[in-house]
Swiss-Prot record:
<dbReference type="InterPro" id="IPR036183">
    <property type="entry name" value="YajQ-like_sf"/>
</dbReference>
<dbReference type="GO" id="GO:0000166">
    <property type="term" value="F:nucleotide binding"/>
</dbReference>
<dbReference type="Pfam" id="PF04461">
    <property type="entry name" value="DUF520"/>
</dbReference>
<dbReference type="InterPro" id="IPR035570">
    <property type="entry name" value="UPF0234_N"/>
</dbReference>
<comment type="similarity">
    <text>Belongs to the YajQ family.</text>
</comment>
<dbReference type="GO" id="GO:0005829">
    <property type="term" value="C:cytosol"/>
</dbReference>
<protein>
    <recommendedName>
        <fullName>Nucleotide-binding protein Gmet_3206</fullName>
    </recommendedName>
</protein>
<keyword id="KW-0547">Nucleotide-binding</keyword>
<dbReference type="InterPro" id="IPR035571">
    <property type="entry name" value="UPF0234-like_C"/>
</dbReference>
<comment type="function">
    <text>Nucleotide-binding protein.</text>
</comment>
<dbReference type="InterPro" id="IPR007551">
    <property type="entry name" value="DUF520"/>
</dbReference>
Length: 161
C-alpha cells in the first residue's frame, strides 16, 4: 500500500551557519559599533541580546535574511516576546521548530480528510503518515497540503509504492 510521511525538520547545521553569518554581519555593521548586542545558538533556541528595541528588530531582520539565504523557512521559527534584561538591554528568544506538534498534526489530518480522497492520515510522534491505495490520490494530497498555509514548513519524505 503506497504511503508517504509528512515532517517538519530544520537542518541545524544550516541554522548554525546562518547564526554565525548574522553574528559576523552584526560585528561589521556601522550601526552596531560600540553595541553590546549578541546572538547565541543554544540547542533549539536562538538568544538575542540587544541594547534597545531598534537594534533588536535590526538583528531579527538580519537573522531572517540569513535564514532565507540558507534555505530555511521563516515558518520554522517561533518568536518569543521581547523582554527587558539587566542593564537596560532587551532580550528575545527564537525557538527553532522541529517536528509537527499534535495540534498541527490534527490540522494536517483534517485537511487530508476534507479533500475526500481515499487516503488516511495517522499522527506518529512528530510526523504524519499518509497511506492510500492509489498513488495519484497521495500525490493529490501532497498538492493540497502544499497549497494550504498551516503555519509550519512541511516536507514530504519516504514516498513508498
Amino acid at each position: 500500500m503506497p504511503s508517504f510521511d509528512i515532517v517538519s525538520k530544520v537542518d541545524m547545521q544550516e541554522v548554525d551557519n546562518a547564526v554565525n553569518q548574522a553574528v559576523k554581519e552584526i560585528g561589521q555593521r556601522y550601526d552596531f559599533k560600540g553595541s553590546k548586542s549578541e546572538v547565541t545558538l543554544e540547542k533549539d533556541a536562538i538568544k538575542i541580546l540587544a541594547d534597545d528595541d531598534f537594534r533588536l528588530k535590526a538583528i531579527v531582520d538580519i537573522l531572517q535574511s540569513k535564514f532565507i539565504k540558507r534555505g530555511i523557512s521563516p515558518k520554522a521559527l517561533q518568536y518569543g516576546k521581547a523582554e527587558t534584561a539587566s542593564g537596560g538591554m532587551v532580550r528575545q528568544i527564537i525557538t527553532v521548530q522541529q517536528g509537527i506538534s499534535k495540534e498541527k498534526g490534527k490540522e494536517v489530518v483534517a485537511v487530508i480528510k476534507d479533500t475526500k480522497l481515499k487516503v488516511q492520515g495517522q499522527i506518529q510522534d512528530d510526523q504524519v503518515r499518509v497511506t492510500g491505495k492509489n498513488r495519484d490520490d497521495l500525490q493529490e494530497a501532497i498538492r493540497t497540503l502544499k497549497g494550504k498555509d498551516l503555519g509550519i514548513e512541511l516536507q514530504f519524505v519516504n514516498f513508498r509504492d
